[in-house]
């Protein structure tokens, strides 16, 4: 399809950047004046239906004293410490730094809520964000220039998936309720339409891209999944789920491995080389509720799923059909809230997810804070909570940049950038 121009590409004048002047406090520091409203204690102690090996704890854990990383590395060099112990030491050190994370900058560029978020793969201070109105912002918060802003169509243009083009990071892939999955640049030019529904009743809800296999995969609201190459050639278009495909994920270490999540309460794992129809999946992972997301870990060995109620599950490659563990966590679905999705940390075995307090949740306390929760991916224990009393909304999307030292959060109309307090001082 011939390239065409998107309307109203501009430098936005609606960005509000807010450097933090006074130190915001952690949920634990707020407990005395909030009558200890933060979640405490353990969550449900029951085993999940499929005999998972552990059930995560709802309350934050007390971190052990941080060991010397230099000493641990020296012990490893001498053969006295295993590499997993080195990794554990690095993770423990990072968790201690999370206590000093504060909001570095804040932007409110959209007139509708943020719906998708993607970090630039090589620039650790650049993030792209899409909105319910189809607007897209490219924001380098490390410089004072105004972000680049691409105006959307408004109602019905929601950006449901956003990925930088791994072969040319001046371009990005986007799936939308407008009825297309497309490749475009940040000047507003549509370079190629990969999928188009040609009807207002069908739209695209999910997207993923693989640089090594040069594949693009996208899912729609009636259960179809389309696989294409980067030249736009359709390889297959099959109905893989009974209902909306909320998430598609290509395994980062095994290109032919695909996970799909749906509101039909299943996550399915596929071998792209053997897909013949909806019954040709390798594994079907049933859930109690519709599923918002299914994400592979950076090493490809684990799968993280988020339902629309109160469960986060971790599956392992050693046994895909049975969850390794279950984390009870309140993040229920609400029509006017961007679906909450848990995400992996890019370097450590940690899970980050926004909390939507639920009075019906077993461990809920009155006036529970809307925190960003960080869990250990091995044990399911909550390790840390981030909270700013001046930005106390629900953070639906939370993702660390590829370096793992900066967190971006989508909270309603706002985009929050979290980093160490010392980083703000240096700026």
From Swiss-Prot:
Any one of the GO BP annotations: DNA repair
Keyword terms, alphabetized: Acetylation, Chromosome, Disease variant, DNA damage, DNA repair, DNA-binding, Nucleus, Phosphoprotein, Repeat, Ubl conjugation, Ubl conjugation pathway, WD repeat, Xeroderma pigmentosum
Biased composition annotated in UniProt, kind: Basic and acidic residues: 1-11
Location within or outside the cell: Nucleus; Chromosome
Pfam families noted in UniProt: WD40 (PF00400)
Region (Required for interaction with DDB1): 68-79, 87-98
Membrane-spanning ranges: none
Post-translational modification: Phosphorylation by ABL1 negatively regulate UV-DDB activity. Ubiquitinated by CUL4A in response to UV irradiation. Ubiquitination appears to both impair DNA-binding and promotes ubiquitin-dependent proteolysis. Degradation of DDB2 at sites of DNA damage may be a prerequisite for their recognition by XPC and subsequent repair. CUL4A-mediated degradation appears to be promoted by ABL1.
Keyword Protease among UniProt keywords: no
Modified residues (Phosphoserine): 24, 26
One cellular-component annotation, GO: protein-containing complex
Region annotation Disordered: where it falls in the sequence: 1-30
Protein family membership: Belongs to the WD repeat DDB2/WDR76 family.
Written domain comment of the UniProt record: The DWD box is required for interaction with DDB1. Interblade loops of the WD repeat region mediate most of the interaction with DNA. A hairpin between blades 5 and 6 inserts into DNA minor groove and mediates recognition of lesions and separation of the damaged and undamaged strands.
Protein name: DNA damage-binding protein 2
Gene source species: Homo sapiens (Human)
């Amino acid at each position: 399809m011939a390239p065409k121009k998107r309307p109203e590409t501009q430098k936005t004048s609606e960005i509000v950047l807010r450097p933090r002047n006074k130190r915001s406090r952690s949920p634990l520091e707020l407990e005395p004046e909030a009558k200890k409203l933060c979640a405490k204690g353990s969550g449900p102690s029951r085993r999940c239906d499929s005999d998972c090996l552990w059930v995560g704890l709802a309350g934050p854990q007390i971190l052990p004293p941080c060991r010397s990383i230099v000493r641990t590395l020296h012990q490893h060099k001498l053969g006295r410490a295993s590499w997993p112990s080195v990794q554990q030491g690095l993770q423990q050190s990072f968790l201690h730094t999370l206590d000093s994370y504060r909001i570095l900058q804040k932007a409110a560029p959209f007139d509708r809520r943020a719906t998708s978020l993607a970090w630039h793969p090589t620039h650790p201070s650049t993030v792209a964000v899409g909105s319910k109105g189809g607007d897209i912002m490219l924001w380098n918060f490390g410089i004072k220039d105004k972000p680049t802003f691409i105006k959307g169509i408004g109602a019905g243009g929601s950006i449901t998936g956003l990925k930088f083009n791994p072969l040319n990071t001046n371009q990005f892939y986007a799936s939308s309720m407008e009825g297309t999955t497309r490749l475009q640049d940040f000047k507003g030019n549509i370079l190629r339409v990969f999928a188009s529904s040609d009807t207002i009743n069908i739209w695209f809800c999910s997207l993923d891209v693989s640089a090594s296999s040069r594949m693009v995969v996208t899912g729609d609201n009636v259960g179809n999944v389309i696989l294409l190459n980067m030249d736009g050639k359709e390889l297959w278009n099959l109905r893989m789920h009974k209902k909306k495909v909320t998430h598609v994920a290509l395994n980062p270490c095994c290109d032919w491995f695909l996970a799909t999540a749906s509101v039909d309460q299943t996550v399915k794992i596929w071998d792209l080389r053997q897909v013949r129809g909806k019954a040709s999946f390798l594994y079907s992972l049933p859930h109690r509720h519709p599923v918002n997301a299914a994400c592979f870990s950076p090493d490809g060995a684990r799968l993280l799923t988020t339902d629309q109620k109160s469960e986060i599950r971790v599956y392992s490659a050693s046994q895909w059909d049975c969850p390794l563990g279950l984390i009870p966590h309140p993040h229920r679905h609400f029509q006017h809230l961007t679906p909450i999705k848990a995400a992996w940390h890019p370097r450590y075995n940690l899970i980050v997810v926004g909390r939507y307090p639920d009075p019906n949740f077993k461990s809920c306390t009155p006036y529970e804070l809307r925190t960003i929760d960080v869990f250990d991916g091995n044990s399911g224990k909550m390790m840390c909570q981030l909270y700013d009393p001046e930005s106390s909304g629900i953070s639906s999307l939370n993702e660390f940049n590829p370096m793992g030292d900066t967190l971006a959060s989508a909270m309603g109309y706002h985009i929050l950038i979290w980093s160490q307090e010392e980083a703000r001082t240096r700026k």
